[in-house]
A protein has these predicted regions:
Chain A
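Hydrophobic alpha-helical segments within soluble ligand-binding/sensing domains
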Residues: 34, 89, 143-170, 186, ...
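Hinge/cleft segment of the Venus flytrap/periplasmic-binding protein
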Residues: 26-45, 175, 179, 183, ...
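Short beta-strand elements in bilobed, periplasmic/extracellular small-molecule ligand-binding domains
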Residues: 71-83, 171-174, 192-213
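Short beta-strand elements at the ligand-binding edges of bilobed clamshell
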Residues: 79-81, 135-160, 174-175, 206, ...
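Hydrophobic alpha-helical
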Residues: 103-123, 191, 205, 209-271
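Extracytoplasmic "Venus flytrap"
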Residues: 28-65, 69, 73, 77-91, ...
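Flexible loop/hinge segments that line or gate small-molecule binding clefts
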Residues: 111-149, 168-171, 265-274, 278-279, ...
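Short, solvent-exposed amphipathic alpha-helices that sit
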Residues: 58-73, 150-157, 182-201, 215, ...
Length: 338, 369, 704
């Protein structure tokens, strides 16, 4: 390794020397050896993205940003799409372990399923970045939202609207996604941390929607029938909560029920805020996550440390979008990223 | 065309199954021909004709008058010719027409024949004839290429050179009314002046209007056997003699050009695979697997080369009744059937027997209608 | 013409058309097509995915196969029973839940967790089994309903325990071993799978429960009539399915330690695809563990290959769906048409040129006469299929019948008869051994010996298997005629190795050397094939020199002489060629002559067809068997030849009403006895000028 490095430096030195010789005639600037190394190291590397599924804003957004950098820096970027199937995802991950790419970007369906496999992957020398949904295993890096924080912000917003005397009642409903996913497990923790300090807030319903807007719609429909005086609702993901919102609108309680949701901050979510479907939209900003992800990918690929040696994480900042601050800067479309 | 048929049509037919119409429906086999009264045994008995003076029949080179005596009959020779008689027809006025192989048509009465030698037709293959009410004689020529006795060769060569011509009532002038037929082998006049012709190799009955140049129109197709001579049935129907059965093996050989050509070139016609007028005792005759005698019994449904079959059609040309002599019988090779005075007679040329049929059902066009 | 004939002959000698049909008769052919599909898939994957073949791929595949394959086995068992189990996916999810709750939440030992998991599967399977087996509900609807029910249960329980499951990891080395461990590089879970699969294979293919399962699946009513407890068998199939699914779920839990809302969703389709693709017939009764494994590997390779190709997930599912449809379609067509295809391609005619028959005059020795027209009939209507006739020293007449008996007609008038022995198959050739035992070739069975008291014993029913034969030719299919050499060795002919007794005539259409001459030595008890590639070897008779024998090659219309001993040992020459008919049995006659029974007469049209194999093949394919061209076997003829092979007499049944197709003769004291395999009578006729004291027994073994 050392020898290799020395040779490499030697080579760079030689090139630099010839550069000086040829440059003596006219000043053409200096070659930046770090730039060359940066590019050379990244070139030809292999990065694989294992999303929950392709075909929705978050994964498409990240993929678009990651692909851009891969193109720019000339490393290969592939996607293994398990189409919402945990089983297919584990199979893909398992075959990736034997395939040995340089880096895996994993999007966990729940905090357990990939946990051991990710550890195995790192043991096999593959660096692993987890994106937005963590697993129990901490890997080289995690980039994404701090779900606890989202939960706290959402709960705080609902508490502000539904504390005794502020809303029609103190009843709050929670629509979760998949009970074993990080977004559920940690967000609920955040929510209850706040709610536990406000014992007057009543949680009248807490059901899993499996990220399915239709299911979310029917759940909220039922909740509203049982509790026509519902004051607030916390949804776990904007895509599913379009269903929640439409149930609220259908019941004509758009102004009564305060709906908080979170998501990647894409244009559709923003429009829903504008339309008054979502009252508060906590955005974890996909383009930003994508850029951080890119930085992490580049950092890890350049790093000489072996997989799993150092574990870092970065919880990216959140933006609270309401009708008041919906603007171009906070929202994105896929075309913007491409 | 169904999808299946269409798909099959896309591929060469080399392996497609070959089927022949089953003896079914109105042709459901029975033993009525086998059990019919056997009036007379006369070798090579062939064509029956009803005249005012009684029933005539041809056999070999001679012409006989049939004199029934209850359950038997005797044959009285009334004329002899130099070559085998190929057809006999009789007009309402008692005039006869006799086709003699290679010796033209003899018209008139025994002893007072007027010979007509139709030009441009094959005079040795005059297979059938019938007089119209105006005295015109219609004659079938089975094939332009072969004499009547070589009918099998014509079949194997895929012959379709048969003709029908008309002989004027007075001047004896000849006029072809139809050609390109596949062995016309029987003719009868229908009530409206049209002719019914049996086209043996196409297993069908066609009608021809002698007054127009219209193409023949099939009225009865896909017969289960090769049709032979026709005669009018009382009540406007039609009697049909069918001289040999159709078999899958024959149809196969007819499609297998290479095999058939070599068979025709190297083997005696008697031993060919193909229809026959009678079963043969010779050990060198071809056999189908189903015709093997099992436990001393030859199954009646065995695929024999010869068969006896007579059918009666109503005035619309729809078969109404059939008489059979099956593989285990011997009244095979029926070449002629006619109705006289309420009785129906048939000739089994294969066995040389004159039969009187027990006619049954009555549907408006029957023998006793 | 000659050149093209020569080409034709070469083409049929060197192109083994028949192999295709023979391969199709093999029962393993059902597995071959899925296996070929598997090989093709692997090759394609290797071609388009670089680095597909690696140790990692295989250990990865092995791990996946252990779970997926177990569920495939479960479904295979149910499909074999004639049902279907759509609830495997939901059942799987419930069992995973049971395992994880036991391990992660309750912290139970692995053994207890396994028991709990299996119990869950058992209960689920039992519910299916009772509903379908005992309450006779439709399998499809029932398992569709239980699919929904089990899934609903899962959906109710799962959210309540989800956090608890993901919140803790059990500390259990056994659990980890099952999940990740490997033994000499082989994943432990795969070893578990292999053990279960082998066990299931043995149970399904070798043990009674497996046979019963197939019987029930194949023909429920027949199985019931055969005394099988259909209800119980069906019920147990579902229980087995539940337990196997639970086992798979246990392995899954150990591997992932977690579950998601989607666990098991869509599994039934993937597994169904695998099972059908592997060749398990949805109709029930047909399939094996091998099928399930092949299908599973195929589907796993396909899915993981597609994922590695970075195909969008929905496209993967679309492709799997299309594959399932194709497999189901193929299965339906294959089951329906395999027999048909076999019928079409099995018959494989070859080129056989017989010498031109000479035309014969009235004075020819072969001229047709009617000397057999008025035979004395024996046993008319009492015997069916007397292929061979033989007389003992007391003048009693023996013959075999197609009812599987040997009948004895008692001298002197042969009016009375009795069943001498019951064999079970149709006895063909008969001959007396020097000790008075009656030896017989039994169609479909072998060579048997009947002691004078009627006791039956097997002599031999197999010979050495030839190396290059596709069909198993070690068993005797159609032993035809036999004779005994002076030293007691039994020489017998086997007419064809390609057809059963009932289809012997089809062999005529092939005209190939499908038969052989076999020798059994009672001293060593060994049976060896002496000559093979003979064209329907039929009658066998030992010559008077005690060193050679004559045997007939029926479709070749010739008699051969073969020396099995003495200075000419091993020599084979034509004794009599270009016979007018097809020789069947050969027997010694008085005055040093031999009798040849002619089974049928040659016809020129058939001779011509024998030179046109393609014509015969088309005939076999295009027209019904009853219509096939055949030698003329409706006439009877017997030839008498001198020791040097000259035809000296011919006896005919001109009309063929009493004795068509004579298959054997036996001269005895001035009479000639006639048998026919498709006849219902035996005939005897006086031979003018024959020695009235001559008997075959005396000629062979000397006078008593």
């Amino acid at each position: 390794m050392r020898l290799l490095k020395t040779t490499r430096w030697l080579a760079v030195a030689c090139i630099a020397l010839t550069g000086i010789v040829t440059a003596s005639a006219q000043d053409k600037g200096l070659e930046n050896p770090r730039s060359t190394t940066f590019r050379k190291t990244l070139e030809g590397k292999k990065v694989v993205f294992l999303p929950l599924s392709m075909g929705f804003d978050l994964t498409e957004g990240w993929a678009a940003v990651m692909r851009q950098q891969a193109k720019r820096l000339n490393y290969s970027f592939e996607i293994r799409d398990p189409a919402w199937s945990t089983d297919a995802g584990t199979k893909a991950l398992q075959s990736l372990i034997s395939e040995k790419p340089d880096l895996i970007v994993a999007h966990n369906p729940d905090i357990q399923s990939y946990a051991r496999l990710l550890a195995q992957a790192q043991a096999a020398g593959i660096k692993v970045v987890q994106i937005n949904l963590e697993s129990n295993t901490q890997t080289d890096s995690y980039v994404g939202a701090d779900w606890t924080e989202i939960g706290e912000q959402a709960a705080q917003a609902v508490v502000d609207k539904c504390s005794p005397g502020k809303g029609v009642s103190t009843k709050v409903a929670i629509d979760t996604g998949v009970p074993t996913a990080a977004s559920d497990v940690f967000q609920l923790d955040g929510i209850y941390r706040v709610l536990n300090q406000h014992p007057d807030i009543q949680v009248v319903s807490q059901q899993a929607t499996e990220y399915n807007p239709e299911k979310a719609r029917s759940i909220m429909d039922t909740v509203l029938q049982q509790h026509p005086d519902l004051c607030g609702a916390i949804g776990i993901w904007d895509n599913q909560d379009t269903g929640t919102a439409s149930a609220i609108q259908q019941a004509g309680k758009g102004s009564q029920v305060f709906l908080v949701t979170s998501g990647g901050g894409n244009k559709v979510g923003c429009e829903n805020v504008e339309n008054g479907l979502f009252n508060l939209y906590i955005s974890y900003n996909v383009p930003l996550q994508g850029e951080i992800l890119n930085a992490e990918i580049a950092r890890l690929l350049l790093s000489d440390s072996s997989a799993g040696e150092t574990k870092t994480l970065y919880f990216n900042p959140l933006t609270q979008i309401t009708k008041a601050n919906v603007n171009q800067r906070n929202c994105w479309t896929l075309d913007d990223l491409k | 065309m169904g999808l299946g048929a269409f798909v099959r049509g896309l591929f060469p037919a080399g392996d497609a199954g070959i089927s022949v119409p089953a003896m079914d429906g109105i042709f459901k086999p029975n033993n009525r021909l086998e059990e019919a009264e056997r009036l007379l045994s006369l070798s090579a008995i062939d064509n029956l004709a009803v005249t005012p003076g009684g029933l005539l029949c041809s056999a070999g080179t001679r012409l006989f008058r049939i004199e029934p005596h209850g359950a038997t009959a005797t044959a009285v020779e009334i004329a002899g010719f130099s070559a085998p008689v190929t057809f006999v027809a009789s007009a309402a006025d008692g005039r006869l027409a006799v086709g003699v192989e290679g010796d033209g048509i003899h018209i008139g009465q025994p002893g007072a024949w007027r010979r007509i030698d139709p030009r441009g037709v094959n005079g040795s293959c005059l297979t059938a004839g019938a007089f119209a009410s105006d005295g015109t004689l219609f004659v079938c020529v089975g094939s332009r290429e072969h004499p009547a006795r070589d009918w099998k060769r014509d079949l194997m060569e895929g012959g379709a050179s048969g003709e029908v011509f008309a002989v004027g009532p007075t001047d004896g002038s000849c006029r072809v009314v139809a050609s390109g037929l596949a062995f016309p082998n029987g003719v009868a006049l229908l009530g409206d002046g049209r002719l019914a012709i049996s086209e043996s190799w196409r297993h069908r009955i066609v009608t021809i209007d002698p007054k127009s140049a219209a193409r023949p129109v099939a009225i009865l197709e896909d017969l289960p056997a090769y049709p032979s001579r026709l005669s009018p049935a009382s009540g406007g129907g039609l009697w049909m003699a069918l001289f040999a059965p159709r078999r899958q093996l024959f149809e196969l050989v007819l499609r297998e050009d290479d095999y058939r050509r070599e068979m025709m070139a190297t083997i005696d016609p008697d031993e060919w695979i193909g229809p026959e007028l009678a079963g043969s005792a010779r050990p060198d005759q071809p056999l189908s697997q189903g015709s093997v005698r099992q436990m001393g019994v030859l199954k009646p449904w065995a695929p024999s080369r010869s068969y006896g079959l007579v059918a009666r059609c109503d005035r619309n040309g729809v078969p109404r009744e059939s008489w059979h002599s099956r593989a285990d019988g011997s009244m095979h090779g029926i070449t002629s059937v006619c109705e006289q005075g309420g009785d129906v007679y048939a000739t089994s040329r294969g066995s040389g027997t004159l039969l009187r049929l027990a006619a049954a059902a009555n549907d408006g066009g029957s023998a006793h209608g | 013409m000659a050149a093209s004939d020569a080409l034709l002959r070469l083409r049929y000698r060197f192109v083994p058309d028949r192999l295709f049909g023979e391969l199709l008769t093999k029962s393993w052919i059902d597995n071959v097509i899925p296996a070929l599909a598997l090989v093709a898939t692997v090759l394609i994957m290797v071609w388009i995915i670089p680095g597909f073949v690696s140790v990692g791929t295989f250990s990865d595949l092995a791990r996946q196969l252990s779970e997926f394959g177990l569920v495939a086995l479960a479904l295979t068992i149910v499909i074999l029973s004639g049902g279907i189990d759509l609830s495997v996916g939901s059942m799987f999810a419930l069992c995973v839940l049971a395992a994880l709750v036991s391990m992660n939440v309750l912290g139970l030992p692995v053994g207890v967790a396994l028991a709990a998991t299996l119990a869950t599967g058992l209960v689920c399977g039992l519910l299916n089994g009772v509903l379908i087996g005992y309450l006779r509900l439709r399998a499809f609807i029932t398992t569709l309903v239980t699919l929904v029910i089990y899934r609903a249960l899962y959906d109710i329980i799962f959210p309540r325990v989800a956090s608890a499951i993901v919140g803790s990891m059990p500390v259990s080395p056994t659990w980890d071993l099952i999940g990740f461990g490997s033994f000499r590089g082989v994943p432990v879970s795969f070893i578990i799978f292999v053990l279960i699969a082998v066990g299931a294979h043995i149970v399904l293919s070798r043990l009674r429960p497996g046979w019963r399962l197939r019987a029930v699946g194949g023909a429920r009513r027949s199985a019931y009539n055969a005394g099988i407890n259909v209800k119980l068998t069906v019920c147990l199939a579902y229980v087995a399915s539940g337990v196997l699914t639970a086992t798979a779920a246990f392995l899954f839990s150990a591997r992932l330690g977690s579950t998601g809302a989607d666990t098991g969703i869509g599994m039934e389709i993937a597994v169904l695809t695998a099972v059908v693709l592997g060749g398990v017939s949805l109709g029930g009764g047909r399939g094996s563990v091998g099928n399930a494994v092949i299908g599973s590997v195929l589907v796993l390779i396909l899915t993981s290959g597609l994922i590695r190709l970075s195909m969008p997930g929905s496209v993967n599912q679309l492709i799997l769906g299309l594959v399932l449809i194709a497999a189901v379609l193929f299965d339906a067509k294959w089951v329906k048409n395999r027999g048909k295809l076999l019928n079409k391609v099995y018959i494989s005619p070859t080129y056989l040129k017989l010498a031109e028959q000479t035309t014969r005059g009235e004075q020819d020795v072969l001229a047709v006469n009617d000397r057999l027209g008025a035979t004395q009939l024996i046993g008319l209507g009492q015997v069916e299929g007397p292929e061979d006739v033989v007389l003992d020293r007391d003048d009693n007449l023996y013959t075999g019948t197609r009812h599987g008996t040997i009948v004895r007609f008692l001298a002197p008038d042969y009016a009375r008869s009795e069943v001498f022995a019951r064999i079970g198959g149709h006895p063909l050739g008969l001959a007396f051994a020097p000790n008075g035992d009656l030896l017989t070739c039994v169609g479909g069975m072998g060579v048997y010996r009947v002691a004078p008291d009627g006791k039956v014993a097997k002599v031999t029913d197999e010979t050495n298997r030839s190396l290059l034969s596709v069909i198993d030719d070690s068993r005797l299919r159609l032993p035809d005629d036999l004779d005994v050499a002076p030293d007691g060795r039994i020489f017998f002919s086997e007419a064809t190795i390609r057809y059963e007794m009932s289809e012997w005539a089809v062999d005529a259409l092939e005209g190939r050397g499908n038969g052989r001459l076999i020798c059994h030595d009672p001293k060593t008890g060994s049976t060896r094939t002496v000559l093979r590639g003979l064209i329907f070897p039929n009658g066998v008779t030992i010559c008077r020199d005690g060193q050679s024998l004559l045997f007939a090659e029926t479709w070749a219309c010739r008699i051969n002489r073969y020396w099995f001993d003495g200075p000419n040992k091993g020599k084979l020459e034509i004794f009599l060629d270009n016979l007018p008919g097809y020789p069947d049995n050969l027997n010694r006659g008085s005055d040093g002559t031999y009798w040849i029974a002619l089974l049928g007469m040659r016809t020129r049209t058939f001779d011509l067809a024998m030179r046109k194999p393609a014509f015969r093949r088309r005939m076999a394919r295009r027209i019904a068997a009853d219509e096939w061209m055949f030698p003329n076997i409706n006439r009877g003829c017997v030839l008498r030849v001198s020791a040097s092979g000259e035809i000296i007499d011919a006896l005919w049944d001109k009309a063929g009403e009493n004795h068509p197709s004579i298959t054997s003769t036996c001269e005895h004291k001035g009479w000639l006895y006639l048998g026919g395999v498709s006849n219902n009578r035996i005939g005897r006729v006086r031979i003018e000028g024959a020695d009235p004291e001559w008997t075959s027994q005396g000629d062979y073994w000397g006078r008593r």
